[in-house]
Regions:
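Short, electropositive alpha-helical surface patch
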Residues: 111-119, 150-167, 222-237, 260-276
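Active-site acidic/histidine proton-transfer and metal-coordination neighborhood
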Residues: 50-51, 70-171
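N-terminal pre-domain/capping segments
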Residues: 1-93, 117, 128, 166, ...
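A cross-domain feature marking catalytic cores of carbohydrate-active enzymes
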Residues: 5-9, 31-35, 58-63, 97-99, ...
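Acidic/histidine-rich catalytic cores of soluble enzymes
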Residues: 19, 29, 59, 125-225, ...
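A structural motif
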Residues: 26, 89-92, 138, 203, ...
Length: 280
């Protein structure tokens, strides 16, 4: 696998970003640019990655195409289309978003409507519409799994891939987001193995993080955290990823704020990988 993440830290442009990239030791990164970034600046970021043999693994959308505000929803949809078009032009394999929600609580919030048949059909239409507008050849549009939003299981994701029925719709793996109940948490290694076994042919990018649940506090609270701060068995999980994914599969750390936090998490996983003969 190619272990990496988001390059964090203070930078004002590609030159300072490149310095952080080198220090990070990342082999794969999220795109530090978007469709709104001036092309000269985008090209400078890409050149920095090329100089150091780093793969730009994914470009994010992270906007709610089902926003209850029609203007915001339309803007989000146009951004998704633009990001996918940019990814395809630049050869970035994964353009990732979440399915969307009509909740007023937030762009990625839980809502009773998230699991209705009407919403499921709307997701299919939305994904098809985005892909059909762009007609990508190299990039894939993917949905990140969410604890309270489709897709929320490997079987659900497989069914969605079949129902969308577009060759450029693929999978973005976030197994911690799908560890959304005590059963999956307590059998996390087995569940992650199931995710990889079923979805590996479709996975274009993977997020890696940790999770924890207090064993006696009621009621259940599952808390995402950085690798090493939770209870996941990364020796076994890295082996699953190593055996189940291609050697050049990007595996990305996320949701940290500072360079130091990413550095610590990367070092933790790199140490485990080294102890177990796993190439990153």
């Amino acid at each position: 696998m190619l272990l990496g993440g988001t390059v964090a830290g203070p930078y004002s442009g590609p030159v300072e970003w490149e310095e952080l990239l080198v220090r990070s030791r990342f082999k794969a990164v999220t795109a530090p640019f978007s469709m709104h970034t001036p092309r000269k600046e985008t090209d400078a970021y890409r050149a920095a990655c090329d100089r150091h043999g780093v793969v730009i693994a994914e470009i994010g959308v992270w906007k709610n195409v089902f926003d209850p505000d029609p203007a915001a929803a339309a803007e989000a949809l146009d951004f998704a289309v633009g990001q996918l078009a940019l990814a395809d032009e630049l050869g970035i394999p994964c353009c990732v978003n979440i399915a969307g929600t009509v909740s007023a609580a937030g762009w990625d919030a839980a809502d009773p409507s998230n699991f209705t048949e009407e919403t499921y059909e709307r997701i299919i239409r939305s994904v098809r519409g985005i892909i059909d507008r762009v007609e990508p050849k190299r990039s894939f549009y993917c949905l990140e799994p969410m604890p309270w939003m489709i897709p929320d299981s490997p079987d659900n994701y497989l069914q969605l891939i079949r129902d969308v029925d577009r060759p450029q719709f693929a999978a973005h793996m976030d197994f911690v987001n799908m560890i959304n109940c005590p059963r999956r948490y307590l059998a996390s290694v087995e569940f992650i193995g199931e995710c990889i076994k079923k979805l590996a042919p479709y996975i274009k990018s993977t997020h890696i993080k940790d999770t924890r649940m207090h064993p006696t506090n009621l009621t259940t609270i599952l808390e995402e955290c950085s690798p090493g701060e939770g209870t996941l068995d990364f020796a076994r999980i890295l082996k699953i990823l190593d055996e189940g994914l291609p050697a050049d599969a990007p595996v990305l750390l996320e949701h940290m704020t500072t360079f130091e936090e990413y550095e610590k998490a990367y070092g933790y996983l790199a140490g485990i990988a080294g102890e177990n003969g796993i190439s990153i």
